[in-house]
Amino acid sequence: MSDSVILALGIAAFTVIVLVLVAIILFAKSKLVDSGDITIDINDDPEKAITLPAGGKLLGALASKGIFVSSACGGGGSCGQCIVKVKNGGGEILPTELSHINKREAKEGYRLACQVNVKGNMEVELPEEIFGVKKWECTVISNDNKATFIKELKLAIPEGEEVPFRAGGYIQIEAEPHVVNYKDFDIPEEYHEDWDKYDLWRYVSKVDEHIIRAYSMASYPEEKGIIMLNVRIATPPPRQPDAPPGQMSSYIWSLKAGDKVTISGPFGEFFAKETDAEMVFIGGGAGMAPMRSHIFDQLKRLHSKRKMSFWYGARSKREIFYQEDFDQLQAENDNFVWHVALSDALPEDNWTGYTGFIHNVLYENYLKNHEAPEDCEYYMCGPPVMNAAVIKMLKDLGVEDENILLDDFGG
C-alpha cells in the first residue's frame, strides 16, 4: 500500500472520528443545555402564565416578564426572601436552599426562586401581592447626611405614578456596574472627625455586575410622590480594614440630586397589627427608617389613640436625627412619648438624658415596672446586636413571639 493511500485513509479516519465527536457533543448539548421556549404556569391562572426561552434562574425569568419577587441579596441565595412554591418542574432542591427552607417546606415544594434552574415547563405558586409590584425610574431629590454614617436619600417618583406601600414596607434599589471613590463623597464638616480618624476616605468600591438590595422606607404613605430611605454606609469592620466596603451603600452615598435610580416594590411584612394593644418601638442606627414610617403613619394618617412609645439608641448627640419631628409629635399627641439613650456620649454633648444600651434603658425605665409587658406589641429595627439583646430581654419578660415584630433591613 502506497504512502499516499495510507495518508488518505488516515485523514479519512480522523475526519470520521471528529464527526462522531461533534455528533456526540451536539446530542449532549440538546439534552443538557436549555433551549427553546418553555411555559411557566402561575397560580393555576392561564392569564398569568408566561412563555420565554429556557435558561437562567426562576427569579430572573419572572423578572423578565415584570413579576418581581423580593430578593434583598439580588439573587445570591443568602437572604432567603425569594421563597416560592414550585408545584412541577425545577428539579431537586439544592443544598444552598436548605438553610432557608426546612424539610416540611421542601416536601411541600417551596424553593428559592434565585436557585431554581428554568430548563422546562413549570408550575409555580406566588403570593397574589407580588402582582402589585412594579419598577420605577426615580430622580434623586436630595441625599444628605443625618448622622456620621447615615444619609437620607429622597427620591421623586415619576409624575403621575404612585408606590402603594404600607408603613413598614420596603423597596429594592438597583445599580449597574460602577466605581465609587469615597474621597468624592459630599459629607458635612461636622461629621469628618470619625471619617478622618479611620481614614475612610481611602476606600474604593468597584462593582462589575448589576446588583439589587432592599431598604426599608422612612417615608409614610401620606408623603406622596417621594420615597425616603435612611442608608448606613457599610464600611469594612475595624478588624478587617482591607475588606471591601458595602456595594450598594457605597453606590447610594455617591448619588447626587438629579441622578436617576431604579427601584421596585413595594414589598414587606413588617406591618402594624390592627389591634388596640400598646405599641413599643425600639430602634438604633438606620433602623430609624421603619420606626419613622410606622410612627408617622399611626399619628399623622390614622390619628391612632393607641398608647405608644419610641426608644432610640445612638452613640452620641450628633447621631440623633428627626429629633424636631418626634418632639413635635410628642407635643401634639398625649398617647405618644419618645426617648433617646446615648451609649457613648461626648463631653461636649452635655447630655442629661438616658445613657447606656437601649435594651437596658427600656427595661430599667419602663418595662421593669410595667403591669403587663407581655400584652404590648414590640416593633424593632436596628443593628443585629441590639435586636438580639432586645429579643432576649422581651423573652425573659414572657413576651410571646407573636408580639415581637422585627425588621432585619434597617440596621
UniProtKB/Swiss-Prot annotation:
What's the protein's topology in the membrane?
Single-pass membrane protein
TM ranges are 5-25
List the InterPro entries: 2Fe-2S_ferredoxin-like_sf, 2Fe-2S_ferredoxin-type, Beta-grasp_dom_sf, Cbr1-like_FAD-bd_dom, FAD-bd_FR_type, Flavoprot_Pyr_Nucl_cyt_Rdtase, FNR_nucleotide-bd, NqrF
**Single Gene Ontology MF annotation:** oxidoreductase activity, acting on NAD(P)H, quinone or similar compound as acceptor
Give the subcellular location.
Cell inner membrane
Q: Which positions in this protein are listed as binding [2Fe-2S] cluster?
A: 73, 79, 82, 114
Give the record's GO CC terms. Answer: plasma membrane
**SUPFAM superfamilies linked:** 2Fe-2S ferredoxin-like (SSF54292), Ferredoxin reductase-like, C-terminal NADP-linked domain (SSF52343), Riboflavin synthase domain-like (SSF63380)
Q: How is the cofactor bound?
A: Binds 1 [2Fe-2S] cluster.
Q: Which reaction does it catalyse?
A: a ubiquinone + n Na(+)(in) + NADH + H(+) = a ubiquinol + n Na(+)(out) + NAD(+)
Q: Which domain of life is it from?
A: Bacteria
Q: GO terms for biological process?
A: sodium ion transport
According to the UniProt entry, what is the EC number of this protein? 7.2.1.1
Q: What cofactor does this chain's UniProt record say it requires?
A: [2Fe-2S] cluster; FAD
Q: Which parts of the sequence belong to the 2Fe-2S ferredoxin-type domain?
A: 36-130
Q: NCBIfam families of this UniProt entry?
A: nqrF
Functional note:
NQR complex catalyzes the reduction of ubiquinone-1 to ubiquinol by two successive reactions, coupled with the transport of Na(+) ions from the cytoplasm to the periplasm. The first step is catalyzed by NqrF, which accepts electrons from NADH and reduces ubiquinone-1 to ubisemiquinone by a one-electron transfer pathway.
Q: State the similarity comment.
A: Belongs to the NqrF family.
HAMAP family listed in its UniProt record: NqrF
- For this entry, the protein name equals Na(+)-translocating NADH-quinone reductase subunit F
Gene (name only) = nqrF
